[in-house]
Amino acid sequence: MTRPVRTRFAPSPTGFIHLGNIRSALYPWAFARKMKGTFVLRIEDTDLERSTEASVDAILEGMAWLGLDYDEGPYYQMQRMDRYREVLAQMLEKDLVYPCYMSTEELDALRERQRAAGEKPRYDGTWRPEPGKVLPEPPAGVTPVLRFRNPLTGSVVWDDAVKGRVEISNEELDDLVIARPDGTPTYNFCVVVDDLDMGITHVIRGDDHVNNTPRQINILRALGGEVPVYAHLPTVLNEQGEKMSKRHGAMSVMGYRDAGYLPEAVLNYLARLGWSHGDAEIFSREQFVEWFDLEHLGKSPAQYDHNKLNWLNNHYIKEADDARLAELAKPFFAALGIDADTIARGPDLVGVMGLMKDRASTVKEIAENSTMFYRAPAPDAQALAQHVTDAVRPALAEFAAALKTAEWTKEAIAAALKAVLGAHKLKMPQLAMPVRLLVAGTTHTPSIDAVLLLFGRDVVVSRLAAALA
């Protein structure tokens, strides 16, 4: 009988979490949802020097923002030490591990000799018990490490969902340290015990873990566990072709939120960063889960494309509810010195979002492009001299007068503008540009009738009158 699907995301809370990291949560999450399985969150926090609570918070916050909900966890490895020690004791009883007294200095010297001889540096099994072998005397005062008794013959073979069949000879693998002298277990051992205890059926992770896989499989088999399906994801590259990392300028997951990206856009983009469904570029979370499979995971490194993300974000911004955008934009307005009271006194923010969103790649950009609605106009002197000429002043005055009595609709404003243009034999830019400058302080706005409608009759008429006085 096939086991119910159980996947996991197992990050180390040692700082920065970027798109390349969180992709290793997205794909197992999607696979678990697709297969009606269970998605487990496990925090691998055994690196006490580098693990921080702030990093855990960043992981949880990033997952929550993208909607990557987990069914179990978060489990913390540091809270499972008793379980690891229990399994270590069982392995000692079964002669699956053995104490090794080789010092770090001795191991370094051994590796140097091996390199000099053109051999692969590895532990040579000095302390591995074998029938008829006489072991050295344990040195006084030295606490040993525990090494796993790796098989000496045969191969580790698995059918990777991304890489295909992978075969590693056991002769290539030395006896791995699975417990340090102080008794704390090492990474590869903890991972195996966790995957076994948590019933993980599919391990979907970055291909930087490929070298760990044969070692983990051997430990898992020694413990009587069933080997999961492995899918090792190729690296995510930055735009310069380097591995994505903080050192190479990668943005944190929450940095995208703080830059004005929508989570649905980032999730859509991230989904395509190593997986495809035909030519589909834009799809909902629900479609992604419905379509996701391991067969269409990419086999080559995926390269981050910021322009592509901006294009996707613009699409989702245009589709987004204007009231939602208004709430998201408020912090960006605040950062620009436009507080809630100023917004409340100005044009309807929801309406501003509806008008301004089509041209923006981010919510931050919408706010930046919309400051004209909440600040007094301060047009450039050169632009004023160019557009507000003596020749156009009579038309401006007539337009202002018409707006005093016109019905305040987009259609009525457009009709008044058209009538003045006809009466003065002007082309649209000759009147629209000075009106934009005097009312909004800039010539760069959407359709003039839509902009004036949002400003409101009183503001428009008073600003035109003040400029013409």
From Swiss-Prot:
| Pfam families found in the cross-reference section | Anticodon_2, tRNA-synt_1c
* InterPro entries for the chain: aa-tRNA-synth_I_cd-bd (IPR045462), aa-tRNA-synth_I_codon-bd_sub2 (IPR020751), aa-tRNA-synth_I_CS (IPR001412), aa_tRNA-synth_I_cd-bd_sf (IPR008925), Glu-tRNA-ligase_bac/mito (IPR004527), Glu-tRNA-synth_I_codon-bd_sub1 (IPR020752), Glu/Gln-tRNA-synth (IPR000924), Glu/Gln-tRNA-synth_Ib_cat-dom (IPR020058)
- Superkingdom field: Bacteria
Binding annotation for ATP: 246
Q: Does Electron transport count among this protein's keywords?
A: no
Q: Where is the composition biased (Basic and acidic residues)?
A: 118-131
Region Disordered, as annotated, extends over 118-139
Q: Which keywords appear in this protein's UniProt record, sorted alphabetically?
A: Aminoacyl-tRNA synthetase, ATP-binding, Cytoplasm, Ligase, Nucleotide-binding, Protein biosynthesis
Where is the motif 'HIGH' region annotated in this sequence?
11-21
Task: Motif 'KMSKS' region: list the residue ranges.
Answer: 243-247
Instruction: Answer yes or no on keyword Nucleotide-binding.
Output: yes
- Xref: HAMAP family: Glu_tRNA_synth_type1
Q: Report the NCBIfam families cross-referenced here.
A: gltX_bact
Name of the molecule in the record: Glutamate--tRNA ligase
